[in-house]
Amino acid sequence: MKKANPSGRCGSFGIPLRAVLGCLLLCGVGILCGCWDNAEINGRAFVLGFGVDAVDNPVSDGDDRYDFTFQLAVPVSGESDEAGAMEYMDCTVTQRSPAAAIRLLERNLGRQVNFEQLNLILFGEELSRQSFIGLTELFFRRASVRRQSSVAVCRGSARDFFAAGPDTHAIATDASVALQNYDGKGRSDGVTMNLHSLFKVLSNRDEFYLLRMAAVTPDDVENTVSTGLAAHDGEKPRMLAIVGAAAYGRSGGYRGELDGEEIEWLRLAVGRQTGGMMKTVDAKSGRTAFYQIQQSDCEVKCGVEKGIPWFTLHWQVRCLPSDIGDIFYGSGTSENPSASDTEQMLEETLTAQFTALTEKSQRELGASVLGLQDLTRQRMPDWYEANEEQWETLYARARVEIRVDCTLGGGGITR
C-alpha cells in the first residue's frame, strides 16, 4: 500500500499540489474568459458616426420624428478567414429620439450598440437650421464620448454624407480627423467643436458659436482637406471638404452661414487671429500679396442716440509681409509700393472686410458675432434691460462706424 504524501507535493518534482491545481484553474478561467470576450465583441456593433436628419417622408405636418443614421463597424463572426475583421455599414432608422432609435437598431441587428468609438455627430443641412441641440443630450452623459466626438453640420443630408464614403472604412473617422486638422493646434475658438466644447457653450449660455460645415465634393473644389473617397462610374474623384460654418445664437438658434474666408476675417475682427494670413490685391498692379497677422485689437465705444444704439469700432492690426505672393513694400514705385502705401492698402482691405462682416451681423448673424450684445449689456445695463425684447430690431438699425489702423513690420522687405 502506497503511503500518503504528507508534504502535499506532486510526484518527484517537489511541486506543491495546490500550485498545480491553481495553474489548472487559472488556465480554465483564461480559456473561458477568452471565449466570453470574443462572444461579447461579436455581439456588439461599434458606432463610428451618428447622423441626424429631418424626417424624409413625414406622415403629417406635425411629424416629430427624425431619420437617424448610424455608421457602424461590425465584427465579422464565424470560422471564415475574415473572422475578427470589421465590416462597415450604414443603418438608418426613423424614430422620435436617439434612445428609441438605438433600441430599434439593436433589435434589427441582434447586437448591442456601443458608442465608445464614436468619432462624429453630424446634422444634416435642413435640420441644422432648426432646433436640434436636444438630440445631443443623450451623449453628454458619456464622458469618453464627449471628449472624442466632433460635432458638425453638412451639406445635404447626413445619410448621404455617410454613404459617400468607401466600403473599406468609415468616412465619419476621416471627417473627424479633417475637422480637427483644418483649424490646427491653438485655433480652437469654437469653430471646430467636440461634444464637450458644445456642452460648455450651452451650459455657459454663450451668445454665439459656430459649427463647421463639411461636404463631399468633386476634387476641383477649394479647401478640400482629405482625399480617398471612391468615385462612382463616370464621376470625378471626390474629396471631403470643409466649406464654412453654420452660426448659432443662444440655445442653438440658427443665425446663418459663414464661408471659410468670412471665418478668417471674423477671427481677426474679434482678436482671435494670431499667426494667420491676410490676402490683399494691389489696385494698381493687380498683384497679390500675403501678410502674416501678429496682433489684432479692437477698441469699442457705444451709446444711444434718439433711441437707436451706435457703435464705433477701432481696430489696430500689426502684420508682417510673407514670403508668399507677388509684391512687398519697398522703394515707393508702382511695382514696389512704399510701406505707407502698403499700410494704406491693407487698411482699405481690412475696412472693406470688417464693414461687410458688420453689415452681415446686422442683417442676419446678430450683434453677438462681434461681441456687441454683451458689451451693450455691460456698459448700458439699464437701457439694455428696458429694450432687450426689441434688441435685434434696434441693432439692425444701429449706426456703426469702422476705423482701421495697420502697422506693417519687417524692415522694408522687397522682392
Map each language-model feature to its residues.
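N-terminal secretory signal peptides that target proteins for export/translocation
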Residues: 1-14
